[in-house]
Amino acid sequence: GRRLCQHVDRVRLLEHELQAGLPTLDPAGEARVRLPVAVNADSLATWFAPAVAAFAASAPVLLDVAVDDEGHTAEWLRGGAVLAAVTASARPVAGCNHRPLGAMRYLAAASPAFVHQHFADGVDAASLARAPSLVFSPKDELQTRWVRRLCGQHVELPRHTLPSSQAFVVAAAAGMGWGLHPESLIAEHLRQGTLVALLPNLPLDVPLYWQHARATSGLLDGLTH
């Protein structure tokens, strides 16, 4: 079913561009085409919306954005639910174009009071096994990856689940737990001291990629650029 939906979306893109080339097919010039995209929440909360706003304002499209973990957005593309995705997958999906976007830098951070309460003796496997952490969803492995990099072993983390990038920041600043946050999203909190980095010299950089269906479409190309 999803494959069929993706095929229909591609056909609609091509039909729209045919109409654009032959105005008599759409004399009102009001037809808009649906463009389904999958994006990870942190990209949506930081750079994605500003990056596509100008395109969405000038092109006859209606963006339909689905949110999922960056490690799973490629599945939306592979399954045919979307025509493009921001993903952490370095492997191109079959039938798709693939280009690197750069890396999103994450810092482990918490409120000063939380750090004093849970990490007064340092950030190590023992303290991390006791201190509540924040995760976006059961799919979110960023905290686990950062801990494994720090400790060289798996640590079972107590966790609160908060499926919102903004709620992550608010909860951390309120002392609910520690978590991995996009550096750009918490920069002001770090400057004001409402959040502190657990280990400032141990960021986690997550490479991101843009993948989109290999359809001959000026709209997809416009969104990509």
Feature locations, PLM:
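Alpha-helical "hinge/linker" immediately C-terminal to small N-terminal DNA-binding modules
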Residues: 1-27
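Immediate post-signal peptide segment of exported/extracytoplasmic ligand-binding proteins
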Residues: 26-35, 127-130
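Central regulatory/effector-binding core of bacterial HTH transcription factors
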Residues: 30-94
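Short, well-ordered beta-strand segments
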Residues: 34-39, 85, 109, 134, ...
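A late-sequence structural motif
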Residues: 47, 200-225
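Beta->alpha turn/N-cap motifs
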Residues: 69-70, 87-92, 110-112, 164, ...
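Paired acidic/hydrophobic, glycine-rich loop segments that form the ligand-binding mouth/hinge
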Residues: 83-87, 177-181, 198
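C-terminal regulatory
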Residues: 97-176, 185-205
